[in-house]
Every structure is written in C-alpha cells, then in structure tokens.
C-alpha cells in the first residue's frame, strides 16, 4: 500500500514536470450569453493551451451552451467536458478551477485527489452558496486566483489569512478600439440589474422629452466583437454595477475612446480616478448627468481633461500583460503543487525525484 502511494506521487510529479496533466475550468451555463466573467475564464484556458497545457472547460450538464464562437478566433478549439456525461477523470496531478459562487461544487469535489483553486472575480458572489459557518478551507481549498489587489486583500482578510490569493488582472482584447467613423447619438448601457437600465432610460425620456431621438442600447448578450463594434460607435457609455470589483465594461469603453458615465461601485476599481470618467454616487442623478453630457457632445464641448485621462488608461490591461501574468502565476501554482507532492514522500524518494528532475 505504501509503495503504491509512493509510485502514485512520483508519477504525478513526473507528469506535472512534463505538462502531462489537465486544468479544468468549471463554468456556469450562461445559455450562450457572453458575460465578462465567463469570457475571462475562456481567456485563461486559451492562453494556457497556447503555453502547452491541457486546459479544458468543465460544465455540469450535457446540454451546456458554449460561448466560444461568440468570443472570436482561437476559442473554439478549447475542449469541453460535462460532469453529467460521467466521462470526467481527475487525477492527483490535475487541477480544477472553481468560480467563487460555487461553494456547493467545492464541497462536492472535496474528496477528489486533484488540486482545487477558487477563481474570485466577484466578491459579492462568495456567500451565494456558502453554508453559514463554513469556510473554503473546510473543503480543503487554500488557494485563490483573483483579478485585483483590492479583491485579494478582501479575500485574504475574510478567511483570516488561511487563504492565499494570486492576482491576474482581466485583459481587454485589441478589437476594443476607436471607430474610424463619426460617433452616433447612441448611449451604450450596461447594468447588472435589468431594472436599473429600465429606470435610467425611462427617467431620461420623461425628464428630457426633446431628446427622445437619442437611443439607448442594451449591451448584454451580444457576441464580443459585435459588442465592441457597437460600443465604439456610441457617444457615451453608461455603467451601473454596484458590486463590480474590476470594471471590465468601462475599460472596454475607454479603450474604444467612449467616455463612461457610471455609478461608483462599493469596491472602487483600482484604475478609477475622479478624472477618467463621469462618476457619481447618486443613481437618481444619472439621467440628468447623461443629458448634461449629451448637450456638451452636441456642442463639441466635452471636457478635454476627461479624454486626456482616458488616454493614460488605453495601454493598460493588454492581452500581452495578462498572458505574462498567467504564465507566471500558473507556473508558480504548478511548481508549488510539485513541492507539495514531494513533501509527502519519504526522504529517499524526494532525493530520487530531484535527481530525475535534474
């Protein structure tokens, strides 16, 4: 029995060193809607496959609706596997990446031999399925990947430093770029809650009936490249997401040279400043602020300082920067897993494993 365990560990170490293992990214079924958090998971999987790792998308049901085609070129080659198919095989040398919302999946996978890591993109979802009084550490999880330093600090403090978090910021694809055509009197709007969108445009048309020819465009559910093209032709982007911790949509707008008018979220994004957007803490004022900006746009008198501050952000959060962080952080996680497995070997076996590695 002891020899079997030794052989298993040595085999797992060898496979990790040779990249002969799988990284499963568990995702929710968005029914084909391309939401930013799931798109970011696909980006991690795509980059890891480019680096030679066997990254796969893991979902619960056989009838999962993939979003790969809506993300653009390079995503449709990512393999998908469902739990329902009963074809999932997980080994000691494999990894499962679980979004923060799925505490139930963390509990269900607690006895699997693989390394499990939580992917925190929205701190507000941490408690969604977490049983009161329970911690991720109760399910054997102590490692987290997140998207910002603020969220890293929040998670580590929340779990009393028993969780170690690594930061890989979100990237904004290159197809988010300024349009070569004049902007249209269209306001692109993205809200987490559909009711916020309805309240904003109804209040706007009620308060300013002379601007009824201005169009509001709901940006949710569009394929990514269509989303980017539609955003770039707008004269203004409106963003309401109180529990956002990163702010992907406003960054996409800024990269497209479209000013953002938004409600400051509870966890203020690290990139946000008083001068790089039209920010407010009062949701009631959003319709009035839209009208004020629209009047300035018609008169070609938008604040130039706003555009200058937007320019400073345009080179940030690139795909190249994210790829570097993915390479670094996942490489670190894999090496730590190797060391963890070696620590479970007797001394003579550790020396043997080190000699094999050399």
Ranges and model annotations:
Residues 28-40:
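A short, glycine/small-residue-rich beta-strand->loop->alpha-helix junction that serves as a flexible
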Residues 37-40, 153-227:
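Conserved catalytic-core segment of nucleotide-activated headgroup transferases in glycan assembly
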């Amino acid at each position: 029995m002891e020899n079997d365990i030794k052989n298993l560990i040595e085999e797992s170490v060898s496979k990790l060193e040779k990249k002969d293992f799988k990284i499963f990214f568990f995702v929710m079924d968005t029914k084909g809607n391309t939401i930013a958090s799931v798109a970011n998971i696909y980006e991690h999987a795509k980059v890891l496959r480019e680096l030679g790792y066997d990254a796969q998308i893991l979902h619960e049901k056989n009838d999962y609706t993939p979003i790969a085609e809506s993300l653009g070129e390079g995503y449709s080659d990512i393999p998908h596997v469902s739990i329902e198919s009963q074809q999932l095989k997980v080994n000691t040398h494999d990894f499962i990446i679980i979004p923060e919302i799925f505490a139930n999946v963390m509990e269900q996978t607690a006895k699997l031999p693989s390394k499990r890591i939580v992917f925190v993109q929205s701190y507000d979802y941490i408690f969604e399925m977490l049983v009161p009084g329970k911690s991720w550490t109760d399910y054997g999880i102590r490692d987290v990947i997140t998207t910002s330093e603020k969220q890293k600090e929040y998670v580590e403090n929340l779990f009393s430093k028993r969780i170690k978090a690594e930061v890989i910021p979100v990237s904004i694809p290159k197809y988010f770029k300024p349009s070569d055509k004049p902007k249209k009197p269209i306001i692109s709007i993205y809200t987490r809650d559909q009711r916020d969108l309805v309240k904003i445009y109804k209040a706007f048309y009620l308060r300013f009936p002379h601007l009824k020819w201005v169009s509001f465009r709901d940006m949710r559910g569009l394929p990514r490249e269509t989303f980017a093209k539609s955003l770039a032709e707008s004269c203004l982007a409106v963003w309401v997401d109180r529990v956002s911790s990163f702010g992907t949509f406003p960054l996409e707008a800024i990269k497209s040279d479209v000013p953002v008018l938004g409600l400051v979220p509870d966890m203020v994004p690290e990139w946000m400043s008083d001068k790089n957007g039209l920010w407010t803490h009062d949701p009631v004022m959003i319709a009035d602020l839209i009208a004020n900006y629209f009047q300035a746009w018609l008169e070609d008198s938008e604040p130039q300082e706003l555009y200058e501050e937007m320019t400073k952000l345009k080179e940030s959060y690139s795909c190249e920067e994210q790829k570097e962080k993915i390479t670094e952080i996942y490489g670190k996680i894999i090496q730590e897993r190797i060391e963890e497995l070696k620590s479970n070997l007797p001394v003579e076996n550790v020396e043997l494993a080190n000699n094999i590695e050399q």
